[in-house]
Amino acid sequence: MKVPGIEAIFTYKDVDQNMKRFTCAGQTYPEPSPYDRLILDKHVRFIGDPVAIVAGADERCVDKAMKLIKTEYEVLEPLLDFTKAKDNEILVHPEDNWEALCPVGADNKRNLCAHDESGDGDIDKVLDECDIVIDRTYHTKACQQSMMETFRTFCTIDTYGRLHVVSSTQIVFHCRRIISHALGISPSKIRVTKPRIGGGFGAKQTSVSEIYPAFVTWKTKKP
């Protein structure tokens, strides 16, 4: 750590790659979203996937340190078309510690995070009797909640040695469970506080900003 003010730098080597994975989705346990995440994963899957956590005294020193980090990648054959992902030999999540707690048709060996088929009556028979059958595929554009307050989190260690997470979140107790899974510690060692927030509209129903500061504070015992 050659940059003054840098407190810690973490990579996938600081995270047990064989530990139980977690989901960031704020859903009632057992969550229908698969447990497919690690805080830092050796296997990165897209541009923007985190490869390091840099913690420092201020934003300036962190920005400087980030520019000095060099990362070597082993480039794998990509899977870029989601319509060809099912049962493809290229697996997005090949790891054995991937887990789906709910029977939603998830199977990482088939690139499925969920799958369901349902119908009422003899659908093929009804379609055969129709004069006109229209078969089209529709795609909706991406959307994002535009709340006034953005995602914000800070963490400390309280008097009792617990991890205290103060966050602009809609899911206090889900957040505690998610952080517990991510860090591999008991929920009793975590306290989550939600001050009055400036909007969320569902966007803050996911652990977006809590995991990384929680990890850094638990490791360093510093805010």
Placement of each model-derived feature along the sequence:
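Residue-level signal for pocket-adjacent positions within structured domains
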Residues: 33-34, 39, 86, 129, ...
